């Protein structure tokens, strides 16, 4: 109840059309802010991750390329803005206190002892990147989502959060179905991969082929780790692994 994800005017420097951007827009990658997620020299994603002391300020300064809420484009900058804006809303200015927020709210309550989530130079957690955990702890995070934010008998997320998070918004843009921070098996368009999996499947997609796949109907979470620079989303092996696990249950 401390932060309203549908409220406008969330950042004081946004006094133009950007003032209508909400946290929900950022979570759903439909803020309209100009972005390029291509990992090449000079693109916004590499500029933010490797050259900016305050990643949130950098992402907030991007110009609008589309009307707010009308176009979906995956952006690590949007994820960074969520954490930076929530930190501001909570009035947390101390660097160490800011870096401790995700541990206090998420990682410690779930008992994810291996987790290391790196902050940027300003102290704000680099929420779209730099989260290191063992496969077992990634699986625990997937189980937390599968159980609608309930853990060890406590409801840590509002009831129905995952239903909302795994519902696609009708914004135009990238064809792969996307909810609120989760890639989806079912949406306005069929994804080019994972088509053999149940329709309620959703997943986290990390760098170079890392995946945490949640299949609620099969009561299943599958984690694929590794460092595979040549991995492509259309690579069938993760889908085959999840399919085999489902068939074995």
Give the positions of each predicted feature:
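Alpha-helical scaffold elements that line and support the substrate/ligand-binding pocket
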Residues: 1-4, 26, 72-106, 138-145, ...
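Structured C-terminal helix/loop/strand segments within mature extracytoplasmic catalytic/sensor domains
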Residues: 201-249
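Catalytic cores of extracellular degradative/oxidative enzymes
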Residues: 9-14, 19, 25, 32-60, ...
